[in-house]
Design a protein with these regions (language model features):
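Glycine-rich, flexible loop/turn motifs
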Residues: 2-3, 26, 48, 86-87, ...
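Conserved PLP-enzyme active-site core in the AAT-like
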Residues: 97, 112-115, 123-204
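PLP-dependent aspartate aminotransferase-fold enzymes
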Residues: 37-144
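Gly/Ser/Thr-rich beta-alpha loop segments that engage phosphate groups in nucleotides
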Residues: 3-5, 10, 60, 76, ...
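Glycine-rich phosphate-binding segment of PLP-dependent enzymes
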Residues: 2-33, 37-56
Length: 204
């Protein structure tokens, strides 16, 4: 994942643990005990969460979160802010306007191969622009998900994240925080704990 190496590269402790695990076998179709142990630890850190799902990359984790949220809310449209990988659900924002994602970390993201049926399923808003987010939600009642990073290259304006949470609550919308990059760098448990704003789904 982009920027997820919070322990750096070639960390001796991590390398030894990985090598030991590989020696025990590198392919299993069942959950290993370590997965259960880690899931329990994560839920202890985040008592608002009830379940944990593991993924192999940030992009995959984002795609899984979107699918879970869509199934739960039975609405397909997403208001999105920030960078969330290269899967179809995200890149389809550029079907609406080829520049929709340009202000979200990476400009000129290519959407060739993304089904045209996904057009107008993703709406973008810029960080700290609560008015634009409110406008998106007001205009299209099929928006059932707000998907965003807690913070990247700028701090939230005073009350911004709490306003996002309230917008989600008032409109029956699922709020997803992508903390794949922020991770546990600044706060043990993620940046949402620092700002005291609890999402419905978070990923690290």
């Amino acid at each position: 994942g982009l920027g997820t190496n919070i322990l750096g590269y070639s960390n001796d402790f991590v390398d030894r643990a990985v090598q030991k695990t590989l020696n025990n076998g590198n392919l299993s179709t069942l959950n290993c005990p370590e997965e259960v142990y880690l899931a329990e630890k994560l839920i202890k850190i985040h008592p608002w969460a009830q379940m944990v799902h593991f993924a192999r990359s940030g992009g995959e984790a984002n795609a899984i979160a979107i699918r879970i949220a869509r199934a739960a809310i039975n609405k397909n449209k997403v208001a999105v802010c920030g960078y969330h990988g290269w899967h179809d659900w995200y890149l389809s924002a550029n079907l609406n306007n080829r520049n929709s994602l340009d202000t979200h970390l990476y400009p000129n993201l290519k959407y060739k191969g993304v089904p045209n049926d996904l057009k107008n399923s993703i709406y973008t808003f810029n960080y700290n622009d609560i008015d634009k987010l409110s406008e998106i939600i007001t205009k299209d009642k099929q928006v059932g998900i707000i998907k965003m990073e807690v913070e990247r290259d700028q701090k939230p304006n005073k009350g911004f994240l709490k306003k996002v949470r309230k917008l989600a609550d008032d409109n029956g919308i699922i709020l997803i925080f992508d903390e794949c990059t922020s991770g546990f760098r600044e706060t043990f448990g993620g940046l949402h704990l620092k700002y005291n704003v609890v999402p419905d789904i978070a990923m690290f």
